[in-house]
Amino acid sequence: MATLTTRQQQIYDLIHQTIQRTGFPPTRAEIAAEFGFSSPNAAEEHLRALARKGVIELTPGASRGIRLRAEGGASPHQFSLPSMGLMQLTLPLVGRVAAGSPILAAEHIDRQYQVDPSLFSSRPDFLLKVRGMSMRDAGILDGDLLAVQRAAEAANGKIVVARLGDDVTVKRFQRKGRQVELIAENPDFEPIHVDLDRDEFQLEGLAVGLIRPAAP
């Protein structure tokens, strides 16, 4: 790894720890709050310095668009597939999901991937191919593979995979009583409001990490 200043190392460690704990990097605002910076712009300057030293990659326009890079240029948390040295856990990749059938039904499985389970904040049960850019600012882009742990409940603020009627969506979860709000991480998308007494809603799982396939 390149030689980092004390502050740069602290920020790098925070990014690493946040990904390990939540599966996703912190925002600039969260970094600024952690270190007492006056604004997210100060955090941005440190992130750019880390990017120039080659230890992280930044995705323009995404508040959580930060990727750690390991020595040799590989990213340990959002990485290219396949990686022959990391074949320890086999996960099904879920493609399109038919209405009314379980998300892990055989007809939904496009293929199997073998990955290193240590790359995720919790052990995932399946991968879901992301479609669209509604979670862009969380660093989740169209075509990414979201690692998902099956769960029937979620804490507020978690990124979840949910089924609403015939659709499966990835959003940030917020619940108050019998009302659920599914919030995009992109200002171009409005929140989805769910009435649990009226709407057909099912939580399929929690996001625990992300894989970005290599460009063809």
Swiss-Prot record:
Give the UniProt keywords, A-Z.
Autocatalytic cleavage, DNA damage, DNA repair, DNA replication, DNA-binding, Hydrolase, Repressor, SOS response, Transcription, Transcription regulation
Q: Which residues bind DNA?
A: 28-48
Short name of one Pfam family: Peptidase_S24
Any one GO molecular-function label of the UniProt entry = DNA binding
Q: What is its EC number?
A: 3.4.21.88
Q: What reactions does this protein catalyze?
A: Hydrolysis of Ala-|-Gly bond in repressor LexA
| GO biological process per UniProt | DNA repair; DNA replication; negative regulation of DNA-templated transcription; proteolysis; SOS response
Q: Which residues carry out catalysis?
A: S134, K171
Q: Is the DNA-binding keyword given for this protein?
A: yes
InterPro entries named in the record: LexA, LexA-like, LexA/Signal_pep-like_sf, LexA_DNA-bd_dom, LexA_repressor, Peptidase_S24_LexA, Peptidase_S24_S26A/B/C, WH-like_DNA-bd_sf
> Would the keyword Thylakoid turn up in this protein's UniProt record?
no
Which superkingdom, per the lineage? Bacteria
> SUPFAM superfamilies under this entry?
LexA/Signal peptidase, Winged helix' DNA-binding domain
Residues with site note (Cleavage): A99, G100
Q: How does it assemble?
A: Homodimer.
Its family remark reads: Belongs to the peptidase S24 family.
- List, alphabetically, the PANTHER family matched: LEXA REPRESSOR, LEXA REPRESSOR-RELATED
Q: What does this protein do?
A: Represses a number of genes involved in the response to DNA damage (SOS response), including recA and lexA. In the presence of single-stranded DNA, RecA interacts with LexA causing an autocatalytic cleavage which disrupts the DNA-binding part of LexA, leading to derepression of the SOS regulon and eventually DNA repair.
Can you name this protein?
LexA repressor
Q: By which gene is this protein encoded?
A: lexA
